[in-house]
């Protein structure tokens, strides 16, 4: 799958977040969108995922946009999980909309993310780091060709960051991964880097 943006731009009122963005993202390659805090990395990532409309330019996926949600998963600090559910219930709920990787059960996915001991607790009782693990699980273990990760190590301790890096290495090969971050620990594996400051 290829995602292509041509002369793309996004603005709020008179302020351009990015402009004249020309880039193609290809399957099997990992990309980092970098830049300082407040530079528009998250806005660009949301535009790539189709969650935000462009103010100018063109965005193409090479497939019908009404099926796009089946091909893209995302984890981001501003996207919440359903806290009244347990992680087991949440992943079953998620699976109704988007299939999970075929060779793993939900119990195995929970084990891979280190949440076995809390599998039957409501997510509302999780720490912020545990909630971030749930977000990463629903994104990385979705059986989709494109994974978008916005500041994926938010609220993770050193052990959680190491786990994130292991999950990326083990389960994301061959897929199109785009990470929005200014932290090398989050995007050090990426093959290509896009600095959003070049598109102001």
Describe each model-derived feature in a short phrase.
Residues 136:
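Hydrophobic anchor residue at the start of the ABC signature
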Residues 78, 83-99:
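Q-loop/switch helix immediately C-terminal to the Walker
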Residues 34-36:
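The feature captures the beta-strand-to-loop junction immediately N-terminal to the Walker
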Residues 147-151:
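Catalytic Walker B motif of ABC-type/P-loop ATPase nucleotide-binding domains
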Residues 3, 17-20:
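Conserved structural motif at the start of ABC-family nucleotide-binding domains
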Residues 49:
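Helix-to-loop junction immediately C-terminal to a conserved catalytic motif
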Residues 103-118:
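Conserved ABC ATPase "signature" region
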Residues 54-70:
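Conserved ABC transporter NBD signature motif
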